[in-house]
Amino acid sequence: MPTINVNKVDLERLSNISLSDKLIEDRFPMMGVEVEEIFEEVDKNGKKQNMVQFSINPDRPDYLSVEGLARGFRGFMGITTGIQEFEVLDSDIKVTVEENETRPYVAFALVKNVLMDEFVLESMINLQEKLHWAIGRDRKKLAIGIHDFDKVKAPFTYKEIKGDEIKFVPLGYEDEEMTPREIIEKHEKGIKYAHLIQNDKFPIILDANGEVLSLPPIINGTLTKVTPTSKNLLIDITGTEKEAVEETLNIIVCALVERRGTIVSVNVNGKKYPDLTPKSRIISVESINKKLGLNLNPGEIIQALKKSGMDALYEDGNLIVKIPAYRNDILQNVDLKEEIAINYGYEKFDGKLPSVATTGSKDPVEKKCSAMSDLMIGLGFYEVMNLTLSNQDTLFEKMNLKVDEKDYIEVLKPASIEHRVLRTSILPLLLETLYINKHNALPQKIFEVGDCVVIDEEDTETDTKCKNIKKIAGAITHPLTNFNEIKSSTEALLREFFEGFEFENYEHPAFIPGRCAKILKSGKEVGFFGEIHPEVILNFELEHPVVGFEITIE
């Protein structure tokens, strides 16, 4: 889980409550935020500062700043309850968006008169980087720019340019102008994120004078560098998913309101941002009490929702709940039930001992998976962990597989277009991992042991007609890798865990013909291995030969 370090004095100031170490250690975990450490550190001026390190659940990106954390704690403690109304002032600031294939979505907002100091500046920088990871997938999905608005002139333009079309001074090179192409070749951030630039097309944000604000997702220009004396902040979010871009903007501007900032709208191609209109959901009182095992009346439930920064209206057995725009984690009614449980108080729930004594033990399949992981690490592979949710493009299209929609399970209301299908295979995600890491040194040897979900029409025990199966997959990439290398690693794994296996020639669309083998155990196919087809390698934008295997674990 991501962690944040916050200054205790700053947290007290924003929470509007005196915070003893005991209060912090007792109450924050009850609202779902773990306290890792309370410690002292010396700042750059030689003064001792009392600090607190918190672990933040990935589903609460609004807690990734001291501002959001303090806002949540005020509600949890009953200091400030109910939904907060955010005023957004109109302006004539405009952004023109020209065609942009790489990162087509963009949102802007201006927050004026922020009470800026060293604490606020550090908090904003940390929030920016944490959101890059938590929502932005290390800037692949979205990138954030925060600028000193007083140093630029509206209107602004967001477009794509070629690598040598313009020069500007990037952050970190205070007096050296560079072209975008030079930045990805020489600048530390440019080298790190060069893989996000495609076909020599560089997204760029310019002001009315042609000055560069940002080269997303790489680096901002020095011109708009934010300092402790900045007070008017222009925020830009660019990315590949519209919903994620808009939600991230909402989180940032609502955090800045905690610093007495005033939100001002920006017109982006005719649409005003930010949109802080509360969302709403309808949930029945009966379903809440059934899930929580309680007998709360509507008033008690509404009070719990108010403590979580929401509001609700009771009508005919149902609650119409208003949810603030910065809460992107409320996806289903079960999320509301969790909020009610947290703010009702987990300490109020009665614990009951089961009437039957049981003895726990490790699941045999999990035990086998752990042993397989140890063996793969011994063979020089690095273990990775991907999400079970993926998409058709990664799982099938890039692998040259023709798959009927009946052969996989699709999420009805996905939170992201990248996570709309339950994976049926692990190997495609390993190729995606190699793409993300192709800027790192070779050779690269990775593996994963995990769940895949397949349709099971013969399932009579559940209504889902699907089941989880464990698989292990591995991949190797470097200029000289070949069939023999992956055969050697696969055989080592099979000899240890699969008795009576044999190989058979296999024609698989993702592999080179004649360089792929099927793995059989007692005449039943349990896996395959071989050299990945060059077309598939190019589909994943890889640059070197790749070999791989995948085996179903019984």
From Swiss-Prot:
The gene is pheT. NCBIfam families: pheT_arch (TIGR00471). Tetramer of two alpha and two beta subunits. It catalyses: tRNA(Phe) + L-phenylalanine + ATP = L-phenylalanyl-tRNA(Phe) + AMP + diphosphate + H(+). GO terms for cellular component: phenylalanine-tRNA ligase complex. Mg(2+) binds at residues 329, 335, 338-339. One of its GO terms (molecular function) is RNA binding. GO terms for biological process: phenylalanyl-tRNA aminoacylation. It comes from Methanococcus maripaludis (strain DSM 14266 / JCM 13030 / NBRC 101832 / S2 / LL). This is Phenylalanine--tRNA ligase beta subunit. Its cofactor is Mg(2+). Residues 276-351 form the B5 domain. Keywords: Aminoacyl-tRNA synthetase, ATP-binding, Cytoplasm, Ligase, Magnesium, Metal-binding, Nucleotide-binding, Protein biosynthesis. It is an enzyme of class 6 (ligase). Signal peptide: none annotated.
